[in-house]
Design a protein with these regions (language model features):
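Extreme N-terminus nucleophile/cap motif
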Residues: 1-59, 200, 241-245, 249-262
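Conserved beta-strand-loop-short alpha-helix elements that form
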Residues: 2, 103-113
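Residue-level signal for inorganic ion chemistry
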Residues: 38, 109, 132
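Short acidic (Asp/Glu) patches
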Residues: 52-64, 78-100, 117-119
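Glycine-rich phosphate-binding loop plus the immediately following alpha-helix
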Residues: 113-115, 120-143
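A conserved acidic, glycine/proline-rich C-terminal tail/linker
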Residues: 199-242
Length: 262
């Protein structure tokens, strides 16, 4: 399996601390050594860094670790390959344009007997993850030829994720740069940091940061991950089938495929 990393914040924020912890799991403290990638939204633009090498050994990952890019929405991924060979075209996150915006997607899991009909969006690589992303965007494009608000789009996203989940494991992060959508099939955790801020210690490497010194009292930053990245904070664990929509660090919608949306 792979591991996911997402962030939603109300001010441009760097994710160096969380990324430093995640990259250790790419071959050092974890087995996810088959590539990594991270995408930073900057307005309508997107900075995408990818490398099929293990993140713990990647010079590109070290560059990202040293270069504090500030963003309000971030999606990251470290890969342990199961479908598709280890190469750049199979490295998450995947990006496509829809409605004049960059849509970004990362997936943790594996889908069995998954061969959707390719229409407008087609995979470049040969992973089930990219095939699912293309299928999802094809559904959205067919149902909504013109842009709609994400609240109108949510039922379609949830329905598609529910179908993918029925074919295996489907934990995912999805964004268009304005919002961050999360769907949990088996494993996902979340923490929202806001004032009063305190220190945090990474689990995978001896690094501590004092968020009080790095933030303002008005900052709200939510981090999503497959497993908790820090050892001294309380992370909230998603239940299977649970989904959430984040905007500027706050949860604006949530629910479960088993229950009605909140």
């Amino acid at each position: 399996m792979c591991e996911l990393l997402g962030m939603s914040a109300n001010v441009p924020t760097d994710i160096v601390f969380s990324f430093t912890g995640l990259m250790q799991r790419g071959g050092r403290t974890g087995p996810h050594r088959d590539g990594w990638g991270i995408a930073f939204y900057e307005g309508r633009g997107l900075r995408l860094f990818q490398d099929p090498a293990a993140s713990s050994e990647s010079e590109v990952a070290q560059l990202v670790q040293r270069y504090p890019i500030k963003s309000e929405v971030v999606i990251g991924h470290i890969r342990q390959a199961n479908v598709g060979k280890v190469c750049l075209s199979n490295t998450h996150p995947f990006v496509r344009e829809l409605w004049g915006r960059n849509w970004c997607f990362a997936h943790n899991g594996q889908l069995a007997d998954f061969a959707p009909t390719a229409t407008f969006y087609r995979p470049v690589g040969n992973t089930d993850s990219e095939a699912a992303f293309c299928d999802l965007l094809n559904r959205v494009r067919e149902a909504f030829p013109e842009p709609v608000e994400v609240e109108q789009l949510l039922p379609s996203l949830i329905q598609a994720c529910t179908e993918y989940r029925s074919k295996g494991v489907f934990n995912c992060l999805l964004s268009d740069g304005d919002w961050l959508f999360c769907f949990c099939s088996t494993k996902l955790v979340q923490i929202t940091r806001r004032a009063p801020f305190g220190p945090a210690r990474l689990k995978d490497v001896d690094v501590i940061v004092d968020f009080q010194a790095e933030t303002t009292p008005h900052d709200v930053v939510t981090v999503i991950a497959t497993e908790p990245l820090t050892e001294n904070e309380n992370w909230n664990r998603y239940e299977p089938g649970q989904w959430s929509l984040w905007r500027k660090g706050e949860c604006v919608a949530s629910g479960s495929v088993e229950t009605a949306a909140q």
